[in-house]
From Swiss-Prot:
Enzyme class label: transferase
Listed EC numbers: 2.7.7.6
Reactions the enzyme catalyzes: RNA(n) + a ribonucleoside 5'-triphosphate = RNA(n+1) + diphosphate
Similarity comment: Belongs to the poxviridae DNA-directed RNA polymerase 18 kDa subunit family.
GO biological process: viral transcription
Induction of synthesis: Expressed in the early phase of the viral replicative cycle.
Subcellular location: Virion
Top-level taxon of origin: Viruses
Name of the coding gene: RPO18
Organism expressing this protein natively: Fowlpox virus (strain NVSL) (FPV)
UniProt protein name: DNA-directed RNA polymerase 18 kDa subunit
Molecular function GO terms recorded: DNA binding; DNA-directed RNA polymerase activity
Subunit structure: The DNA-dependent RNA polymerase used for intermediate and late genes expression consists of eight subunits 147 kDa, 133 kDa, 35 kDa, 30 kDa, 22 kDa, 19 kDa, 18 kDa and 7 kDa totalling more than 500 kDa in mass. The same holoenzyme, with the addition of the transcription-specificity factor RAP94, is used for early gene expression.
Keyword entries, A-Z: DNA-directed RNA polymerase, Early protein, Nucleotidyltransferase, Transcription, Transferase, Virion
One Gene Ontology cellular component annotation held by this UniProt entry: DNA-directed RNA polymerase complex
Length: 161
């Protein structure tokens, strides 16, 4: 996992009825709802601070909605291939094996090990080591996938500690 900070203009949509005395509050809510803790293009905004002491570019009227470009200071988080993370092993069937972390889902290919059934629950066997369903495992991220709204998605392999 890596972090970086940048200033950027984030476009948000404001409805005409939101153009009132609470305009800045409505803009803040729109920015937070659209960008905070949402994965887009491999990055997730973990902290957003709206910069209020700079001029804001002119808004655009698009299909009866107002598009405002808001100046923000953003802390972004991202994962890259080769990162090592820990999470909970989740096995729903022989072909659906994943490791769930706080904001990342790592899919494990079934051909990298064997799914078996032990003590009335699924387990994953790799190189003779048994990993029980819902146990904590360590994975190495191998390939980025298209993410879900609030989670990064990667293919990966379980590694031994």
């Amino acid at each position: 996992m890596s972090l970086f900070n940048t200033n950027a203009y984030l476009p948000v949509v404001i409805q005409p009825h939101e153009l009132n005395l609470d305009l800045m509050d409505n803009i803040k809510k729109a920015v937070i709802n659209k960008y905070l803790h949402k994965e887009t293009s491999g990055f997730m905004a973990k902290k957003i601070q709206i910069v209020e002491d700079t001029p804001m570019p002119l808004a655009e009227l698009v299909n009866n909605e107002i598009v405002v470009h808001v100046t923000c200071n953003i802390d972004y988080k991202y994962y890259k291939v080769g990162d090592i993370v820990s999470g909970i092993l989740t096995i729903t069937d022989e072909s659906d094996i994943s490791v769930v972390c706080s904001d990342l889902i790592c899919k494990i290919r079934s051909d990298s090990g064997t799914v078996s059934y032990d003590n009335s629950k699924y387990c994953f066997i790799k190189n003779g080591k048994v990993y029980a369903n819902e146990s904590t495992v360590t994975v190495m991220l191998k390939e980025a996938q298209s993410g879900m709204e609030s989670s990064f998605v990667f293919l990966g392999n379980i590694i031994e500690k």
